[in-house]
Amino acid sequence: MLTRLSKLSALMFLLGVSACKSPPPVQSQRPEPAAWAMEKAQDLQQMLNSIITVSEVESTG
């Protein structure tokens, strides 16, 4: 019984020591954004203004 307990204790000790010696996980860096995401955004307001124009108010009568 004592040898079984000592073997188990030795095994647990070795597992604990080996876990402490393992290197920490490497944190991966985020990849750079895609090229299209880095381009300047289009001026959609100007495009809408050229399509939609303010018309005269129609008279109801």
From Swiss-Prot:
It is found in: Host cell outer membrane. Keywords: Cytolysis, Host cell lysis by virus, Host cell outer membrane, Host membrane, Lipoprotein, Membrane, Signal, Viral release from host cell. Residues 1-28 form the signal peptide. It is a lipid-anchor. Residues 29-61 are periplasmic. One of its GO terms (biological process) is viral release from host cell by cytolysis. GO terms for cellular component: host cell plasma membrane; membrane. It comes from the Viruses. Interacts (via C-terminus) with the spanin inner membrane subunit (via C-terminus). Part of the spanin complex which spans the entire periplasmic space. The spanin complex is composed of spanin inner membrane subunit and spanin outer membrane subunit. Component of the spanin complex that disrupts the host outer membrane and participates in cell lysis during virus exit. The spanin complex conducts the final step in host lysis by disrupting the outer membrane after holin and endolysin action have permeabilized the inner membrane and degraded the host peptidoglycans. Host outer membrane disruption is possibly due to local fusion between the inner and outer membrane performed by the spanin complex. Belongs to the caudovirales o-spanin family. This is Probable spanin, outer lipoprotein subunit. It comes from Salmonella phage P22 (Bacteriophage P22). The gene is Rz1.
